[in-house]
Regions:
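Short, flexible, solvent-exposed loop/turn segments with mixed acidic/basic and small polar residues
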Residues: 37-39, 122, 181, 207-213
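Active-site beta->alpha loop and helix N-cap motifs at the rims of alpha/beta catalytic domains
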Residues: 1-86, 101, 108
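An N-terminal-biased, well-structured beta-alpha scaffold segment characteristic
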Residues: 186-228
Length: 228
């Protein structure tokens, strides 16, 4: 099954066997997961990257050396489905110290807009390519502004399909609503603040106006619950 999936893709792929503990659907053991990674790497059309969870690497530090990588890169990933851990920056440093890693990926559930700022700090202090994103209703900012702070990639769901993580925008929202391909380090950020602003039409109007005027700016919904 794994080789046929890869061979059917017209585009470069990232192959991931995401555990249930980190938001995926894989419930097999580590040996099964390792076998699937091997199957992907030895297919006739191997992926451009494979995703290896940091917790799997901690249990099997020899894993990366044993994989037949060839030209395939490794994304070392970590996900916290509950919230921001207290050792976020220490974990980022530890992951970046591991040799032969192409990209470090860190994703956690945002408790408020404040967690997005930590994602941006991680990107600004990165020692190698990094993905730092926040999940949930407060995490959209980190996904849209990833290129502003030098993020390696962001993730979106195809229109009409289920998102692979809570809070993912659709590709149409990223490209058309937020003009994602125009965002860079010099992009100015504006937004509408309030409770339940997710359905505000303001981002549509303002971002369309920014694009028409050639203004390097983006307008975002910034949800702030009562009590903050």
């Amino acid at each position: 099954v794994v080789p046929s999936l890869l061979e059917a893709s017209p585009l470069p792929t990232i192959f991931t066997v995401r555990s249930a503990e980190e938001g995926g659907n894989f419930s097999g053991d580590d040996a099964h997961r390792t076998a699937m990674l091997h199957a992907a790497l030895t297919s006739s059309k191997p992926p451009k990257y494979i995703d290896v969870e940091y917790e799997l690497f901690v249990k099997q530090p020899w894993l990366i050396e044993d994989l037949p990588l060839g030209d395939c890169g490794i994304i070392l990933s970590w996900h916290d489905m509950v919230g921001r851990p207290s050792d976020l920056f220490q974990k980022a440093a530890a992951m970046q110290d591991i040799p032969n890693i192409s990209v470090v990926k860190m994703v956690w559930r945002a408790r408020s807009l404040r967690d997005n700022l930590d994602a941006f700090k991680l990107l600004q202090a990165r020692q190698q390519p990094m993905i730092a994103l926040c999940m949930g209703p407060f995490g959209l900012m980190s996904r849209v502004l990833a290129p502003k702070f030098g993020g390696f990639a962001t993730f979106a769901t195809i229109d009409g399909h289920e998102a692979t993580a809570d809070g993912q925008p659709t590709t149409t929202e990223l490209l058309s609503k937020y003009n994602f391909n125009s965002i860079n380090a010099r992009t100015k950020v504006y937004g509408v603040i309030g409770d339940t602003v997710e359905h505000s039409a303001s981002p549509y109007f303002h971002n369309a106006a920014f694009a028409a005027a050639g203004t390097n700016s983006v307008y975002l919904p910034l949800p702030i619950p009562k009590g903050w």
